[in-house]
Protein backbone atom coordinates (compact mmCIF):
# COMPACT_ATOMS: atom_id res chain seq x y z
CA UNK A 1 0.00 0.00 0.00
CA UNK A 2 1.38 3.36 -1.05
CA UNK A 3 -0.13 6.67 0.04
CA UNK A 4 0.27 9.27 -2.69
CA UNK A 5 -0.97 12.69 -3.72
CA UNK A 6 -1.63 11.44 -7.26
CA UNK A 7 -2.67 7.84 -7.91
CA UNK A 8 -2.02 6.34 -11.33
CA UNK A 9 -2.38 2.94 -12.96
CA UNK A 10 1.02 1.26 -13.09
CA UNK A 11 0.07 -1.86 -15.09
CA UNK A 12 -2.92 -3.19 -17.06
CA UNK A 13 -4.39 -4.99 -14.04
CA UNK A 14 -4.59 -1.85 -11.87
CA UNK A 15 -8.13 -0.56 -11.24
CA UNK A 16 -9.09 2.90 -9.97
CA UNK A 17 -11.90 2.74 -7.39
CA UNK A 18 -13.56 5.48 -5.35
CA UNK A 19 -14.57 4.27 -1.88
CA UNK A 20 -16.15 6.65 0.65
CA UNK A 21 -14.49 9.62 -1.04
CA UNK A 22 -11.06 7.95 -1.02
CA UNK A 23 -9.49 7.24 -4.41
CA UNK A 24 -7.74 3.87 -4.49
CA UNK A 25 -5.84 1.75 -6.96
CA UNK A 26 -6.37 -1.99 -6.53
CA UNK A 27 -4.06 -4.49 -8.22
CA UNK A 28 -2.97 -8.12 -7.98
CA UNK A 29 0.57 -6.85 -7.34
CA UNK A 30 0.58 -5.58 -3.72
CA UNK A 31 3.28 -3.04 -4.64
CA UNK A 32 0.84 -1.35 -7.03
CA UNK A 33 -1.94 -0.86 -4.45
CA UNK A 34 -2.28 2.86 -3.73
CA UNK A 35 -4.44 5.26 -1.75
CA UNK A 36 -4.83 8.99 -2.14
CA UNK A 37 -4.24 11.09 0.96
UniProtKB/Swiss-Prot annotation:
Presence of the UniProt keyword Ribosomal protein in the record: yes
Keyword tags: Ribonucleoprotein, Ribosomal protein
Name of a matching Pfam family: Ribosomal_L36
Signal peptide: none
PROSITE patterns: RIBOSOMAL_L36 (PS00828)
Example of a GO MF term: structural constituent of ribosome
PANTHER family: 50S RIBOSOMAL PROTEIN L36, CHLOROPLASTIC (PTHR42888), LARGE RIBOSOMAL SUBUNIT PROTEIN BL36C (PTHR42888:SF1)
Family, as annotated: Belongs to the bacterial ribosomal protein bL36 family.
Name of the protein: Large ribosomal subunit protein bL36
Organism whose genome encodes this protein: Geobacter metallireducens (strain ATCC 53774 / DSM 7210 / GS-15)
Gene: rpmJ
